[in-house]
């Protein structure tokens, strides 16, 4: 899980999700997981 100021999709299968007022990126590839900090 990477914590970044700006999250973005890395590949086609990445999905942007808003949970508890935080943006998350989830993907089948665990390297693409991101959270906005």
UniProtKB/Swiss-Prot annotation:
Its main location: plastid. Keywords: Chloroplast, Plastid, Ribonucleoprotein, Ribosomal protein. One of its GO terms (molecular function) is structural constituent of ribosome. It is found in: Plastid, Chloroplast. Pfam families: Ribosomal_L36. Signal peptide: none annotated. GO terms for biological process: translation. One of its GO terms (cellular component) is ribonucleoprotein complex. InterPro entries: Ribosomal_bL36, Ribosomal_bL36_sp. HAMAP family: Ribosomal_bL36. Belongs to the bacterial ribosomal protein bL36 family. This is Large ribosomal subunit protein bL36c.
């Amino acid at each position: 899980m990477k914590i970044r100021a700006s999250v973005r999709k890395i590949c086609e299968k990445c999905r942007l999700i808003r949970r508890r007022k935080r943006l998350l990126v989830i993907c089948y590839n665990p390297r693409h997981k991101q959270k906005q900090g």
